[in-house]
């Protein structure tokens, strides 16, 4: 279904891969991109379960916007093992203005398509999505 504000559709693979991450933990992360030709949000990269947060941040292009999902494992103060699913809106300052506008106008609707997201991070610079910042959002 097309996004009314931006005219973008969400490719079915996005929802399928997200459900696999959420229910079977098949992936550690998913990176999504907007395909300007098809005017559709598509899966760009899939992170294997053994890949870490550094692999995830390295997979984001330095000069292009992306959406992403990361399944973070952590230990609570009570020493309980937990995980949370994070939604990232990556919009580096060096990205094209048109791209930043397209990603910004599509974000909320796309996020609603992915049921089960627990936290959101918006970043324009790698320092805004450091592992310490992400961990601080688990409380």
Swiss-Prot record:
Pfam families: Cofilin_ADF (PF00241). One of its GO terms (cellular component) is actin cytoskeleton. InterPro entries: ADF-H, ADF-H/Gelsolin-like_dom_sf, ADF/Cofilin. GO terms for molecular function: actin filament binding. One of its GO terms (biological process) is actin filament depolymerization. Expressed in pollen. Residues 5-139 form the ADF-H domain. Keywords: Actin-binding. Belongs to the actin-binding proteins ADF family. Actin-depolymerizing protein. Severs actin filaments (F-actin) and binds to actin monomers. This is Actin-depolymerizing factor 1.
